[in-house]
Structures are given as C-alpha cells and as structure tokens.
Curated annotation (Swiss-Prot):
SUPFAM superfamilies: Glu-tRNAGln amidotransferase C subunit. GO terms for biological process: glutaminyl-tRNAGln biosynthesis via transamidation; regulation of translational fidelity; translation. Keywords: ATP-binding, Ligase, Nucleotide-binding, Protein biosynthesis. Allows the formation of correctly charged Asn-tRNA(Asn) or Gln-tRNA(Gln) through the transamidation of misacylated Asp-tRNA(Asn) or Glu-tRNA(Gln) in organisms which lack either or both of asparaginyl-tRNA or glutaminyl-tRNA synthetases. The reaction takes place in the presence of glutamine and ATP through an activated phospho-Asp-tRNA(Asn) or phospho-Glu-tRNA(Gln). It is an enzyme of class 6 (ligase). This is Aspartyl/glutamyl-tRNA(Asn/Gln) amidotransferase subunit C. Heterotrimer of A, B and C subunits.
Length: 95
C-alpha cells in the first residue's frame, strides 16, 4: 500500500503537523519506505517460531519490598508555597 501526496497531507493535518510544500515529497517517500519495510516483515513466515517476550532466560534479583527511608514529607513541605493537610496546593489550570 503506497501513500499518495493527499494521504500524507491528511495525516499531517490530523497530527497537527505543518509540512511545507518542499517537505511533502520527502515525507511521502519516507513513509512509503517505512510501510514497505513493514510489508517485508509481515511477509516473513514465522510459523513454528515460538513467541517470546525476552530472548534470554534470565531473572533479575529483586530487593525485598521494605521501607528503607524515613518520612521526609514535613521537611519537604516547609518550603512549599501552599500546603493543606499534607497535600501540595497548586493554582487551578483548567476551568
């Protein structure tokens, strides 16, 4: 499936991208190359290949889930401009 110039213009509009007239041919070619690579990968026969999440059978050593630091909330909130009941107060952004 090859993209046309109009397809790239529509995609750019939907993505809120400003592409100049000079950028459109190069962007169209780049996107078509990417789609061509995806087509090549989809054409590979992977039947009989076991799906895997990690190529190595390795496990990570995890530390115990225990509190290792003391609570510093009060010290951190002393420099905050506004605090109420242990929560930081911030200006309203969305009405």
């Amino acid at each position: 499936m090859a993209l046309e110039r109009s397809d790239v213009e529509k995609i750019a509009h939907l993505a809120r991208l400003g592409l100049s007239e000079a950028d459109l041919p190069r962007t169209t070619e780049t996107l078509n190359n990417i789609l061509g690579l995806i087509d090549q990968m989809q054409a590979v026969d992977t039947s009989g290949v076991e799906p895997l999440a990690h190529p190595l059978e390795a496990t990570q050593r995890l530390r115990p889930d225990a509190v290792t630091e003391t609570d510093h909330r009060d010290a951190y909130q002393t420099i905050a401009p506004a605090v109420e009941e242990g929560l930081y107060l911030v200006p309203k952004v969305i009405e």
